[in-house]
């Protein structure tokens, strides 16, 4: 992974969003900004990012939810990065 993306988040909610909303979730560097997250995801995974939402978790980690364009399939990207 890059210095911004720590690891993909694999939870039941993340899997539902991947299946039904074409979204992926990552734990990212706490100081990463949304444009930086967008650029890294687009360059590393060769996809088009439509939207990025971030949250700070109770464990003091930053969670980024990345919505992919309709042309890109979140399940294909997840299988390429080893989520399955």
Curated annotation (Swiss-Prot):
Quaternary structure (record): Part of the 50S ribosomal subunit. Contacts protein L29.
Question: Which SUPFAM superfamilies does the protein's record reference?
Answer: Ribosomal proteins S24e, L23 and L15e
What organism does the record attribute this protein to? Halobacterium salinarum (strain ATCC 700922 / JCM 11081 / NRC-1) (Halobacterium halobium)
PROSITE patterns found in the cross-reference section: RIBOSOMAL_L23
Q: What are the alphabetically sorted keywords of the record?
A: Ribonucleoprotein, Ribosomal protein, RNA-binding, rRNA-binding
List the top taxonomic levels of the source.
Archaea, Methanobacteriati, Methanobacteriota, Stenosarchaea group, Halobacteria
Family membership: Belongs to the universal ribosomal protein uL23 family.
Task: Tell me one Pfam family matched here.
Answer: Ribosomal_L23
Gene Ontology cellular-component terms listed? ribonucleoprotein complex; ribosome
Protein name in UniProt: Large ribosomal subunit protein uL23
User: InterPro entries, from UniProt?
Assistant: Nucleotide-bd_a/b_plait_sf (IPR012677), Ribosomal_uL23 (IPR019985), Ribosomal_uL23-like (IPR013025), Ribosomal_uL23/eL15/eS24_sf (IPR012678), Ribosomal_uL23_CS (IPR001014)
Function comment: Binds to 23S rRNA. One of the proteins that surrounds the polypeptide exit tunnel on the outside of the ribosome.
GO BP term, pick one: translation
GO MF annotations in UniProt? rRNA binding; structural constituent of ribosome
């Amino acid at each position: 992974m890059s210095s911004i993306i720590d690891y993909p988040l694999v939870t039941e909610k993340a899997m539902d969003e991947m299946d039904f909303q074409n979204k992926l979730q990552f734990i990212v560097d706490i100081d990463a900004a949304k444009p930086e997250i967008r650029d890294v995801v687009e360059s590393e995974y060769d996809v088009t990012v439509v939207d990025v939402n971030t949250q700070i978790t109770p464990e003091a980690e930053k969670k980024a939810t990345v919505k992919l364009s309709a042309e890109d399939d979140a399940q294909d990207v997840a299988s390429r990065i080893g989520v399955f």
